[in-house]
Swiss-Prot record:
This is Alanine and glycine-rich protein. The keyword Secreted applies. Its main location: secreted. Residues 127-160 have a biased composition (Gly residues). One of its GO terms (cellular component) is extracellular region. Keywords: Secreted.
């Protein structure tokens, strides 16, 4: 059915987002040892009840990456950490925007809303502290399909002429001109 198909699609999308969030967190955690700066970023989603949007989380991550690069314990290490953190921030922003679009359009709103929970990573300190949990799932209601439109009626056949006076000799008069011809014929007789 349509409801089962929508639920299946929602589960697959939420699984995809969960894996993407986990990959972003792992990338940020791996880059934490390269720089010695402090900071971190969390993935917030205003669509799942969080107070911050994806763009704010991305901006925070870029700022954190810059601080990590400035305070890094080596030129190569700091730039590597900044690049990895920036890539993780971009992935987090894309995740938040896609999830927001799906929730706003009603796709996957009721299945596993917590799959996109924030994944933060503290640069230089080791493991980062993750952000918030997702909001509870709401039941998705589907609207019924619209009824089909009725077929158009067939057009009537043309009246035949008898070849003498040009008036209709059979059939139902469908047009005002038929009446006009008969009236005119009667007035001339």
């Amino acid at each position: 059915s349509a409801a089962a198909s929508a639920a299946r699609r929602a589960r697959l999308l939420n699984l995809l987002f969960a894996r993407s969030s986990a990959a972003a967190a792992a990338s940020a955690a791996a880059s934490a040892g390269a720089g010695s700066g402090s900071g971190g970023f969390g993935l917030g989603s205003r669509f799942l009840g969080g107070g911050r949007g994806g763009s704010r989380a991305a901006a925070s991550a870029v700022a954190s990456a810059g601080a990590s690069a400035r305070g890094g314990g080596g030129g190569g290490g700091g730039s590597s950490s900044a690049a990895a953190a920036a890539a993780a921030a971009a992935a987090a922003a894309r995740n938040a925007n896609l999830r927001g679009w799906l929730v706003a359009s009603g796709v996957g709103a009721g299945a596993g809303a917590g799959a996109g929970a924030g994944a933060g990573a503290g640069a230089g300190a080791g493991a980062g502290a993750g952000g918030g949990s997702g909001g509870g799932g709401g039941g998705g209601s589907g609207s019924g399909g619209s009824g089909g439109s009725g077929g158009s009626g067939g057009s009537g056949g043309n009246d035949g002429n008898d070849g003498n006076d040009g008036s209709s000799s059979r059939g139902v008069k469908l047009y005002a001109y038929d009446y006009y011809k008969d009236d005119k014929k009667g007035s001339n007789d």
